[in-house]
Structure formats: C-alpha cells, structure tokens
C-alpha cells in the first residue's frame, strides 16, 4: 500500500513551500548534481514519531499563468483527490482573505482532516491575533513560523494524530513496477499488451484513463509482479486543465511505490523535457530503471536508426548510464516478452549485497589503477568501505577527510564497482564519511 498522503494547500505566497521544505528537511537527499536531474520538488516523504507519510506541495503545481482563483481551485481539487490529511496554510500577517475563505469552503466538502496552520507568526505578540482564524470554521488555528521552524512540531503532531491506521506490510517477494511518461505515449496500450488482455481503457486521447488500479500477475516462473498504473489523468469524469503538471504528481506517487520504473518514450515524438524531469525523479529516488521506447513500429528505419536513438538517449539522460534501453511496440508486441525478465534482473540488482571483504578488494584494486587525489598537498586516504543498504545499493566509504573526495573520484569508484558486480538498471549510491 502507498504511504498516507498529506497535501499542503493555500493561496500563493503564504509559505506552503517553506513549510513543505521544513517538514521534508534533509530527507530529500540530492546525491548528485548532474545537469538534467531536476531540483524542484512537489512531492517528498516525511517522518514524525515513527510514522512515515508522503507530502504534496501544491505550490509546486501552481500554474503561474492561470488566473489567481483558478490556481487555488486547482490546488483544492488535488487535495480532495489525493490527500488523507490536508494542511491549510494561511498568513498571520495578512489575516483572513477572500481567497482563504474560498479554500475553506472547498475543504469543508472533502470530509477529510484539515489542519489550519497560521504561518508568519514570527513573534509572540502576533499569537493573540490568530484566533480570528477560528472564523474559517476549520478548528483550532496553529501558529507557526515555517521560516524559523517555530510551531512545526505542533503541525506534525496534528498530522500524525489524523493519519489513517498503519498500512499493512507488503510482500517483499512481489516486484512492484510502474510505467511512467507523458500523457499519450502509449502507457495504457503497453499495459494491455504486457498483460495480454484488456484491463484498462486505452485511447489515443489524453485524459481517458480512469482511477489507478494495481494489477497483479505471475510469470511462467512463478514470480509475482504488481503493476502500478499512474492513471489519474481523468478522475470523477473531469479532465484537469493542467494535465501535465498533475501527471507529474501522479507519476511521482507511482515512482515512490515502485521497485522498478519503466520510463516510456514515444518514438514518434522523441525525448521531451517532461521525460527528463520524470526520469530525474526516479533516479533521485533510487529506483531501478528501464528506458522503453514505444511505437517503434511507426518509424522508418535503416541500419543506423537504433544506434542513433541509443546515442541520443545516453546524451539526453547522462545521469542514467546504468538504465537498459529497449525498443518496443505495444501494437505489434515487438520485444515486449523481454520486459518481465528485465524487471526481475533489475530487482535482483537492487537487492544485491556485497560482502565487505570482497568490496574492499575492489576498492584497493581501483586505488592501484588510479591513486586517490590530493588537495593543497593533502592526499585522500580510504580506510575501508561497507554496504549499508539495498534498494538502491548504498556504500559508505570511510576516509580521512570528506572534502578530499572529489565527485570525479567518487564516480570513478562507482564505475569500478559496476565493473566488478552486476548492477544493471539500478543506481548505486556512494557516500564518503570521515572515520571517527
């Protein structure tokens, strides 16, 4: 099951994103700073009192070109659709506005827990003014200053109190995967073709896939899979005007729940910025990845077409050198039979554990090939390395000074580890840590 979801809503400039970042804190880890990996966030995971939850920053979905009230309406609709708990942020400096009242009326209809956070209460004298917000009819207003972190704990306490019951543990032997990509790249047709039967509605018009339904199936070897459909383009019979930004959020939720992500690209249209943005989210989330070029049957090809495509994909997705590329057709089912086996292999890579002794042999061999760098006369010393996690495989390298571990040398060590062990389709994380 997915983690419970918290939506942070409110009119522009009340501090939604600041509160979002404050709650997310350092749990949003940017492992690499590579061009093409997106840095913006509308979705993250938070934790408080041993309860984990997903968060949506609706401020990240604002359409700045849309009319003011349309932005707010869009946020409220997303919160109603997606959230288990809603945090409604208002400004203590400005008091209640017409836009606040509009959002409140929308939230009454959700029948979901709403936490009223009065932001920008930066000094004790302002606390007396927050009681005016009782007039919104959403219960006790909680004074906070998200910039300074004041009152954030009270909001988190309220979130945890209102979370649904603990979700059941999932079967770790079931491989979860999702197909992500721009609307109308053929995800629904691929799903149908993979399953061999019609389970969802397939249509050439974006906005015709109904509610997401997890689909379970077993291959001929008895391996169980759960396919998580991003769906959500059309809910309650209504197509959201800002479909692409809404689909980003849906894709990110699917990525969060997946072990392996199939990034679907439309061969007729080529690679778009949206593709790189979504792939960047999956990469940063540490998910296994396959790049799937669909509608391959529609292209006129010569002996160089596939090679040219592969080179272009590697150039456009420089942060995904580990991701295999497959050219398929949902219509003719070309190469689709290979996907379940590829997903299994990548899942195995994600769960690989390397004994410390073997890992350190590889590290020492790497140093012999390419000695550690120096900075201002001081040389980096590597004492030992150990694997600390899987999904994705994560290694801590203990050194004399973290600052001496240049990014380029860390990348060199990653490449040497990849040569020694099979990590196809999965990112691996290397972390330099000073030995104490």
Curated annotation (Swiss-Prot):
Q: Which domain of life is it from?
A: Bacteria
Q: What happens when the gene is disrupted?
A: Essential for growth, it cannot be disrupted.
GO molecular function terms attached to this record: GTP binding; ribosome binding
- UniProt binding sites for GTP 1: 10-17, 57-61, 119-122
Domain KH-like: start-end pairs: 352-436
The keyword GTP-binding belongs to this UniProt entry's keyword annotation:
yes
UniProt entry keywords in alphabetical sequence: GTP-binding, Nucleotide-binding, Repeat, Ribosome biogenesis
**Binding-site residues for GTP 2, renumbered to this chain:** 181-188, 229-233, 294-297
Give the protein family.
Answer: Belongs to the TRAFAC class TrmE-Era-EngA-EngB-Septin-like GTPase superfamily. EngA (Der) GTPase family.
On subunit structure and binding partners, the annotation says: Associates with the 50S ribosomal subunit.
Its function? GTPase that plays an essential role in the late steps of ribosome biogenesis.
Specify the protein name: GTPase Der
* Lineage of source species: Bacteria, Bacillati, Bacillota, Bacilli, Lactobacillales
């Amino acid at each position: 099951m997915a983690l419970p979801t918290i939506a942070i809503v409110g009119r522009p400039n009340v501090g939604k994103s600041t509160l979002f970042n404050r709650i997310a804190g350092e749990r949003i880890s940017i492992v690499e700073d590579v061009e093409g990996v997106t840095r913006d966030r509308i979705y993250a995971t938070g934790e408080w009192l041993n309860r984990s939850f997903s968060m949506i920053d609706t401020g990240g979905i604002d359409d700045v070109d849309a009319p003011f009230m349309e932005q707010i309406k869009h946020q409220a609709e997303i919160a109603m659709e997606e959230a288990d708990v809603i945090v409604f942020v208002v400004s203590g400096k400005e008091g209640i506005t017409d836009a606040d009242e509009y959002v409140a009326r929308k939230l009454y209809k959700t029948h979901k827990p709403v936490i009223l956070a009065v932001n920008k209460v930066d000094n004790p004298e302002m606390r007396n003014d927050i009681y005016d917000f009782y007039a919104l009819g959403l219960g006790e207003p909680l004074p906070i200053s998200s910039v300074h972190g004041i009152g954030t704990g009270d909001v988190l306490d309220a979130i945890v109190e209102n979370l649904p019951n603990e979700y059941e543990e999932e079967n770790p032997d079931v491989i979860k995967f999702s197909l992500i990509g721009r609307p109308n790249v053929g995800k629904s047709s691929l799903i149908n073709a993979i399953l061999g039967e019609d389970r969802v509605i397939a249509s050439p018009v974006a906005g015709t896939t109904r509610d997401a339904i997890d689909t379970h199936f077993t291959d001929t070897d008895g391996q169980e899979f759960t396919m998580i459909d991003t769906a959500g383009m059309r809910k309650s019979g209504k197509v959201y005007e800002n479909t692409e930004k809404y689909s980003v959020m849906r894709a990110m939720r699917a990525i969060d729940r997946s072990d392996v992500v199939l990034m679907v690209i439309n061969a007729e249209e080529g690679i778009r910025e949206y593709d790189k943005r979504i792939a960047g989210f999956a990469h940063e989330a540490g998910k296994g990845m396959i790049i799937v070029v669909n509608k391959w049957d529609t292209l006129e090809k010569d002996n160089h077409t596939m090679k040219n495509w592969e080179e272009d994909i590697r150039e456009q997705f420089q942060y995904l050198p580990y991701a295999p590329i497959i050219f398929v057709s949902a219509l003719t089912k070309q190469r689709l039979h290979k996907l379940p086996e590829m997903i299994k292999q990548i899942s195995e890579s994600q769960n690989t554990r390397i004994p410390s002794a073997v890992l350190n042999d590889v590290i020492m061999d790497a140093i012999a090939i390419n000695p550690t760098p120096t900075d201002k006369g001081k040389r980096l010393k590597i004492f030992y390395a150990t694997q600390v996690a899987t999904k994705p495989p994560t290694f801590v390298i203990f050194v004399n000074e973290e600052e001496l571990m240049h990014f380029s040398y860390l990348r060199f060590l990653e490449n040497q580890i990849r040569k020694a062990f099979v990590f196809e389709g999965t990112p691996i994380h290397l972390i330099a840590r000073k030995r104490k």
